[in-house]
């Protein structure tokens, strides 16, 4: 009963990822991912937010990402997707928070998890795309994400087992930062 809805959601997520990945050069912003500081380096409320929200978003995901994506919108619930191989099966797993974590009281946010089995070729293709994107993480201009919009986080693990993570900020349409 839920399989068609899950597949439709997963297809939308994959399509958005591919579109976002290939549109980096088309945007008037930087065309590479920026490095991500370790979440443990943030202090105070922001540090607590990052550690808590990523802990929730990674619920049920493998410790080391093959290909993982997380989105942190300013005013709507955070969500993540992981491409994984478990028990010989290839799956896309998505986690969506029940509400925006930043505005919620502690302990009130739950995780809605959905998963779908994918083909080995899609698994390998998504892994290749994520590795290509995360290998190009640069900090050339020291720019940083703004306050409004969505920050997208991409992570993957290379053949040597090294985890790479980068982020891309996408300002809200119609704002001065988007122009």
State where each predicted segment sits.
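Function-determining sites in protein domains
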Residues: 29-179
């Amino acid at each position: 009963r839920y399989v068609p809805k899950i597949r439709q959601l997963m297809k939308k997520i994959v399509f958005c990822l591919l579109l976002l990945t290939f549109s980096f050069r088309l945007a008037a912003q930087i065309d590479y991912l920026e490095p991500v500081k370790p979440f443990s380096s943030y202090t105070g409320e922001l540090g607590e937010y990052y550690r808590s929200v990523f802990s929730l978003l990674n619920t049920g995901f493998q410790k080391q990402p093959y290909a993982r994506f997380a989105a942190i919108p300013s005013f709507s619930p955070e969500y993540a997707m992981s491409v994984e191989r478990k028990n010989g099966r290839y799956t896309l797993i998505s986690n969506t928070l029940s509400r925006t974590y930043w505005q919620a009281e502690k302990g009130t946010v739950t995780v809605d998890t959905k998963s779908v089995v994918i083909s080995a070729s899609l698994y390998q293709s998504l892994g290749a795309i994520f590795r290509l994107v995360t290998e190009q993480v640069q900090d050339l201009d020291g720019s940083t994400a703004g306050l409004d919009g969505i920050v997208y986080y991409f992570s993957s693990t290379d053949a040597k087992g090294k985890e790479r993570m980068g982020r891309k900020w996408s300002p809200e349409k119609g704002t001065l930062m988007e122009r």
